[in-house]
């Protein structure tokens, strides 16, 4: 599987399918023609280009219902639920974050709670924490899903910061960690290289700090 970080919280997974998570970047290009879009929640910096992409979408149930009402092919999940679409299994996990609201087609809608997602494709399991604070049940996410890669926000202010994300990485126990949701704006500036050094100095985990648009094979 190839993992690409276009920027912010947006991640593209390419294997037997093209799965795009949270299609928003501030300055850059959103990958086109995904087979599946997965949303962690409805805040603008995660919902992004969902309507323009017009691809099958998986989201928390409230948001999926709103998208379905607009004629999109959207599938809803709730915490603990999973669905498999064309060989890609998406599971919804809790996150600790605020409820989101969007204005779609001139109507303001409540988009439900924020979530994390676990995506399994081609024998690889990726956990995208979404926007979240640190919470102790991240240990259960590690025990239940055994992710190969954990995508963790480190920006602070609106999510956990790099120090809390270090604890999250230890709770989850994925062998590879990739920081996301940082340095998009001054309010969420963090030193990702220092985050990498601190984790790799004290654990056996590998931290991959990707440039915007950067990719790795996992």
Curated annotation (Swiss-Prot):
Transmembrane segments: none
InterPro entries from the UniProt entry: Metallo-B-lactamas, RibonucZ/Hydroxyglut_hydro, UPF0173, UPF0173_UPF0282_UlaG_hydrolase
Upper lineage: Archaea, Methanobacteriati, Methanobacteriota, Stenosarchaea group, Methanomicrobia
Family: Belongs to the UPF0173 family.
SMART domains per record: Lactamase_B (SM00849)
NCBIfam families for the chain: PRK00685.1 (NF001911)
Organism expressing this protein natively: Methanosphaerula palustris (strain ATCC BAA-1556 / DSM 19958 / E1-9c)
Alphabetical UniProt keywords: Hydrolase
Source organism superkingdom: Archaea
Alphabetized Gene3D superfamilies for the sequence: Ribonuclease Z/Hydroxyacylglutathione hydrolase-like (3.60.15.10)
One Pfam short name: Lactamase_B_3
Molecular function as annotated in GO: hydrolase activity
Name listed for the protein in its UniProt record: UPF0173 metal-dependent hydrolase Mpal_1063
